[in-house]
Amino acid sequence: MNDIPPIIWHMRRHHPKFVSKIELGKGIPSVSYNLRHGGSALIDRKDSKQALAAIGKLGEYIETHQRSAVIFPEGTRSRTGHPKKFQTTGLKVLMKKAPSALLVPISINNSWKMLRYGKFPYGIGSHLIFNVHPPIPNEGDPEALIEQVEALITRDIQVDL
């Protein structure tokens, strides 16, 4: 939730569209509106058929209109700061539907601290740190590319309590 506005700002020239859980489509001023009306894919994580169809449709859209897509393949935010294992199916679908798209890994540090105690107190004194890695062409073995992306992202995650 706290990472979406900075990513939108950083990637504004590339018109980012998000793969986001359906719950974020309501209740967050500006962000929810953008997710619902900006062409993002709102997925029901309990319904894989709906999720994959929405991600596939987004992939076709970004390929046709030369836009960008943002997906968080680790799924749910870690409660400890240690990265979770990537859920690769959604990323594979995007890579298949948008073969000309570049993969731009982004490591986000300290996002788990923002909601460590729930919504109150709200991560006072915590700073989100983004590390945007160089783009990777969507060429070759998808499994190897996903492993490379995961390694880049997890390498730069710093867990300090």
Locate predicted features.
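Short amphipathic alpha-helical segments
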Residues: 6-9, 55, 82-85
